[in-house]
């Protein structure tokens, strides 16, 4: 029976080829079909897998917000061909639309094989020193003012009442705005950790209380950087 392999990709730019352990690479060298977010980025990742098939003969299928007829992406599985599922960055299905494909695979009794790799969300949580036994990934922070204030109230309650760590990401060009908003609207004793450009040479983990962030806010420029925002006590 065909299998769906969930293949991790590099967190770095330019792409790093030291992501998947060698013994796992051997499991996927035979693949000829891949589902990716973006064809160009997916092709760069696939080249590093050192497949048995040359890249020109690899079938690359895109899954993104413009994709129609998602069921059709699984057709190779039904004819006995294994498929690899890749995110543009990090782990498939984590802050990534790949979960739709995995859900369909389960519905069709296709074996799903997750491979080991790095997640910026978990790396950031590990490095934050905040509660790793009760945490929530919230995706992107709301943009509209009303929804933002509702979210602030919600996460503040969860942080204080349940000691639940809250994790967010943001579009890189809105990072600075989100940082300022959090500092100006959260309670002084809440801890905010920024995990910046993880696994890159300029990686930073910065942790302060909101009170302290207010004193040093102008010191850090995170515009257009890859940042994980982590909140807790």
Per-region residue spans from a language model:
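Short active-site oxyanion
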Residues: 28-34, 110-113, 165-166
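Glycine-rich, flexible N-terminal cofactor/catalytic loop recognition
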Residues: 1-63
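Conserved helicase motor
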Residues: 61-68, 141-145
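Class I SAM-dependent methyltransferase SAM-binding "motif I" and its flanking Rossmann-like core
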Residues: 2-5, 101-158
